[in-house]
Amino acid sequence: MAYQLYRNTTLGNSLQESLDELIQSQQITPQLALQVLLQFDKAINSALAQRVRNRVNFRGSLNTYRFCDNVWTFVLNDVEFREVTELIKVDKVKIVACDGKNTGSNTTE
C-alpha cells in the first residue's frame, strides 16, 4: 500500500473532486473511484522517487518533532529555503517524512 500523503495536494484534491462528480452523475462506481485513488497513490510516490532531482537547502529552528508508525513529523519556525538563485523565508513549516523505499506491499506489476 502506498502512502496517501499526496491526496491532500492540489493535484490530489482536483482528482478527488473530479471522481466525486463522476460518482454523483453515476458515470463511475465508488469502487472504481477508490481504485483510481489507489493507483494515483502508487504513481505519485513512484514518480517523485524516480524523477525529481532538484535540490533545495533549508534552515530553521526546530519547534517540535515526533516519530510514530515509521513516520517522522517536524515543525520548524523561521525557515529559509535556498535554491540556486532563490531564497524564500517562511514563519512555520511542517515536514512529514515517510520511508519511500517500501511501504510493505508485495505487488508485482
Swiss-Prot record:
It is found in: Nucleus. Its main location: nucleus. One of its GO terms (molecular function) is protein heterodimerization activity. One of its GO terms (biological process) is transcription initiation at RNA polymerase II promoter. It holds the Pfam family TFIIA_gamma_C. SUPFAM superfamilies: Transcription factor IIA (TFIIA), alpha-helical domain, Transcription factor IIA (TFIIA), beta-barrel domain. GO terms for cellular component: nucleus; transcription factor TFIIA complex; transcription factor TFIID complex. Keywords: Nucleus, Transcription, Transcription regulation. InterPro entries: TFIIA_a-hlx, TFIIA_b-brl, TFIIA_gsu, TFIIA_gsu_C, TFIIA_gsu_N. TFIIA is a component of the transcription machinery of RNA polymerase II and plays an important role in transcriptional activation. TFIIA in a complex with TBP mediates transcriptional activity. Belongs to the TFIIA subunit 2 family. TFIIA is a heterodimer of the large unprocessed subunit 1 and a small subunit gamma. It was originally believed to be a heterotrimer of an alpha (p35), a beta (p19) and a gamma subunit (p12). Interacts with NCOA6 general coactivator. TFIIA forms a complex with TBP. Interacts with HSF1 (via transactivation domain). This is Transcription initiation factor IIA subunit 2. The lineage of its organism: Eukaryota, Metazoa, Chordata, Craniata, Vertebrata.
